[in-house]
Amino acid sequence: MARPRPREYKAGDLVFAKMKGYPHWPARIDELPEGAVKPPANKYPIFFFGTHETAFLGPKDLFPYKEYKDKFGKSNKRKGFNEGLWEIENNPGVKFTGYQTIQQQSSSETEGEGGNTADASSEEEGDRVEDGKGKRKNEKGGSKRKKSYTSKKSSKQSRKSPGDEDDKDCKEEENKSSSEGGDAGNDTRNTTSDLQKAGEGT
């Protein structure tokens, strides 16, 4: 079947949008929000139903929804596709919320990190919406934790008695406790010689 000649679209038109590596996806021609990056010449801002992601596509990759519903409107196991088919039928006016979330995230970063759990969830939502249809950047971007060394310091400090100021005495006490069967879970300095001694005793 021959492709239709590219045509003009206006904000609010419902279409199937084709991106490389994805099926023809239910989408809407979006209006540009104020302060947004202007699209390249002859490209339209597209809002994808189901994933709520955006992209800029030319008219050759857009197909009118009503005309192509029978051809491209079949359910698909791709994540977000079936939700998109439902949304384009039942809630075609759904708004893109990621732009507002990204704005809130950038303003909270300039104020300083508060460690608020609500901020973390909005960060993940903002990261999901950045790269267009299914290509999600840093979906778990904020979930990695930096190693904390304060817990080791505090455990060593708790072993010191208030009268001890000499580090040698403290280290000797720690070595004695580990070799005499002290709490091995807290002391990770078991050397290979300690392990060899234990192996020879059996």
From Swiss-Prot:
Positions with biased composition (Basic residues): 134-159
Would I find Nucleus among this entry's keywords?
A: yes
Check the record and name the InterPro entries matching this protein: PWWP_dom
The record places the motif (Nuclear localization signal) at: 135-147
Tell me a Gene Ontology molecular-function term this record carries: microtubule binding
Give all residue intervals belonging to the PWWP domain: 11-68
Residues found modified as Phosphothreonine: T110
Q: Where is this region: Disordered?
A: 90-202
List where Basic and acidic residues composition bias occurs.
Answer: 168-177
PANTHER family of this UniProt entry? HDGF LIKE 3 (PTHR12550:SF82), HEPATOMA-DERIVED GROWTH FACTOR-RELATED (PTHR12550)
Q: What does this protein do?
A: Enhances DNA synthesis and may play a role in cell proliferation.
Q: What is this protein called?
A: Hepatoma-derived growth factor-related protein 3
Q: Which organism is it from?
A: Rattus norvegicus
